[in-house]
């Protein structure tokens, strides 16, 4: 069974580094264009997460795949936090905190995927990339809470938390032991 790839790459998509700056349906402020279609990259990453997380190798077919990889790894980080939450409201607070926490971007020490991501070309691109990744993190965390928490008992679903120990591409956005 092959890994799932992003279908959202258009020829006129703007790039930051070698990562696609894709439109998203977001309530958070950031550089991403507003998405008008039903499905955006965050929906795609959440939908394909359970299948893609099992892959140790992932062939990058376009720049949108790099965005998909980042969100997939971020979902893994979110699940580590959400499994410890007792309610959806606590989960939303954790996701907000994780989304705005300082994080490394491509080209910085501590970023685990420097081999496959190009660093920003200049200071302006650096700021756009950081803002875009933060916008993706905030939106992903919020939407993931909707999927992970069972509306009947307000607890995290075991069908999501069972993926906490899985590492996509043998990588993690957090440091070793976190």
Swiss-Prot record:
UniProt keyword Phosphoprotein, yes or no: yes
Domain of life the protein comes from: Eukaryota
Name of the protein in its database record: Actin-related protein 2/3 complex subunit 3
Biological processes annotated in GO: Arp2/3 complex-mediated actin nucleation; regulation of actin filament polymerization
Sequence positions bearing Phosphotyrosine: 47
Coiled coil start-end: none
CC terms in the record's Gene Ontology section: Arp2/3 protein complex; cell projection; cytoplasm; cytosol; nucleus; site of double-strand break
Residue numbers bearing the N6-acetyllysine modification: 56, 61
Keywords from the UniProt entry: Acetylation, Actin-binding, Cell projection, Cytoplasm, Cytoskeleton, Isopeptide bond, Nucleus, Phosphoprotein, Ubl conjugation
Gene3D superfamilies: Actin-related protein 2/3 complex subunit 3
Known partners and oligomeric status: Component of the Arp2/3 complex composed of ACTR2/ARP2, ACTR3/ARP3, ARPC1B/p41-ARC, ARPC2/p34-ARC, ARPC3/p21-ARC, ARPC4/p20-ARC and ARPC5/p16-ARC.
SUPFAM superfamilies xref list: Arp2/3 complex 21 kDa subunit ARPC3
Molecular function GO terms recorded: actin binding
Main location: cytoplasm
UniProt-annotated location(s): Cytoplasm, Cytoskeleton; Cell projection; Nucleus
Tagged with keyword Lyase: no
Species this protein is from: Bos taurus (Bovine)
InterPro entries: ARPC3, ARPC3_sf
Family: Belongs to the ARPC3 family.
Pfam entry (one): P21-Arc
Functional summary from the UniProt entry: Component of the Arp2/3 complex, a multiprotein complex that mediates actin polymerization upon stimulation by nucleation-promoting factor (NPF). The Arp2/3 complex mediates the formation of branched actin networks in the cytoplasm, providing the force for cell motility. In addition to its role in the cytoplasmic cytoskeleton, the Arp2/3 complex also promotes actin polymerization in the nucleus, thereby regulating gene transcription and repair of damaged DNA.
Cross-link (Glycyl lysine isopeptide (Lys-Gly) (interchain with G-Cter in SUMO2)): 14
Lineage summary: Eukaryota, Metazoa, Chordata, Craniata, Vertebrata
